């Protein structure tokens, strides 16, 4: 049980790092950021709060390549309003790119896919070919996917990449069937403070 807890809390820490760092990359008001530490602290006790263990070894929470997808000199991101959707809704996104690398990417395009993690069903959007130069933050095309009808909850991976490069990123979104049941008023009970009795 302890191992499952450490794994689950560690995965949550990774997601928190990802959201926080991407927020910094998406801001035009920040010149940079500094992460205090990435490893577990074992000084006066034990604090298993790091992405790496006390010996700077991988704990199995995230691979180095996946970490670089949101913490690097080139970070490709999607901006979207929610991680949770009902079937039939539109998943709308905007492509953002923070490029601190002086190397220019020529004649490349951005590809965005949304894949069902159970069935493998996949949808794809792509931009026109373009040049990517060193810029603090650039905004590119908007796009939309429609969430398919589903009888049970589904998880989708939304993947974005610059074709022909190692620059990529991914997100998980969750889709649920529409809820048609309504809560009847007969099931609601209201208690007034004057009617409550103190049981001693």
What do the predicted segments below correspond to?
Residues 170-188:
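Low-complexity, Pro/Ser/Thr- and charge-rich linker/hinge segments at domain boundaries
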Residues 149-153:
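Surface-exposed, short loops/turns at beta-strand junctions within beta-sandwich domains
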């Amino acid at each position: 049980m302890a191992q499952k807890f450490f794994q689950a809390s560690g995965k949550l820490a990774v997601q928190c790092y990802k959201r926080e760092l991407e927020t910094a990359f998406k801001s035009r008001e920040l010149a940079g950021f500094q992460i205090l530490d990435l490893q577990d602290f074992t000084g006066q006790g034990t604090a298993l709060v790091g992405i790496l263990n006390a010996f700077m070894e991988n704990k199995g929470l995230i691979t180095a390549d996946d970490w670089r997808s949101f913490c690097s000199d080139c970070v490709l991101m999607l901006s979207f309003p929610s991680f949770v959707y009902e079937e039939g809704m539109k998943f709308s996104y905007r492509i953002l790119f923070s490029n601190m690398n002086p190397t220019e990417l020529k004649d490349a395009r951005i590809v965005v896919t949304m894949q069902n993690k159970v069935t493998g069903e996949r949808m794809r959007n792509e931009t026109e070919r373009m040049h990517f130069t060193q810029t603090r933050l650039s905004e590119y095309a908007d796009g939309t996917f429609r969430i398919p009808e589903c009888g049970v909850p589904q998880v989708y991976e939304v993947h974005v990449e610059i074709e022909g490069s190692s620059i990529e990123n991914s997100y998980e979104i969750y889709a649920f069937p529409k809820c048609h049941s309504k809560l009847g008023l007969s099931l609601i009970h209201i208690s007034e403070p004057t009617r409550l009795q103190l049981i001693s």
